[in-house]
From Swiss-Prot:
Part of the 30S ribosomal subunit. Contacts proteins S5 and S12. This is Small ribosomal subunit protein uS8. One of the primary rRNA binding proteins, it binds directly to 16S rRNA central domain where it helps coordinate assembly of the platform of the 30S subunit. Keywords: Ribonucleoprotein, Ribosomal protein, RNA-binding, rRNA-binding. One of its GO terms (molecular function) is rRNA binding. The gene is rpsH. One of its GO terms (cellular component) is ribosome. It comes from the Bacteria. NCBIfam families: PRK00136.1. Pfam families: Ribosomal_S8 (PF00410).
Length: 132
């Protein structure tokens, strides 16, 4: 059976790993998921990510989760735009997540950027998800 929303699956694996206090989670590889993982590293929500392979030889992304004093750094990670309902916003309409403490992941013509950077660049795009 094929997966309907691979990005939502990635977010769920991260959420489940954090609630189980895992050090690493493994996610099936795709370019967009690798880009999202690198984005989360740059924003400071996860420690690291690297491309690996599963025991079956399939490519995967190994994500090292981040904790501060035993508490997960990621309080909330949520998929917004999904295959059945895409959500696009102009730069003026981009939401502030958790009153500016969180970040919206936006797919723009300039690549994957945060809501703050999209506003600075003056570009809108598809809201991939929210992280706080």
């Amino acid at each position: 059976m094929s997966m309907q929303d691979p990005i939502a699956d990635m977010f769920t694996r991260i959420r489940n790993g954090l609630s189980a206090e895992k050090e690493f989670v493994s996610v099936p590889f795709s370019k967009i998921k690798m880009e999202i993982a690198n984005f989360l590293v740059n924003e400071g929500y996860i420690k690291s990510c690297s491309k690996g392979t599963t025991s079956m030889g399939h490519p995967s992304i190994e994500i090292e989760l981040k904790y501060h004093a035993g508490v997960p750094v990621i309080e909330m990670i949520k998929r917004v735009s999904r295959p059945s309902l895409r959500i696009y916003k102009s730069h003026a309409d981009l939401p502030k997540v958790y009153g500016g403490y969180g970040v919206a992941i936006v797919s723009t013509s300039k690549g994957l950027v945060s809501d703050r950077k999209a506003r600075d660049l003056g570009v809108g795009g598809e809201i991939i998800g929210y992280v706080a």
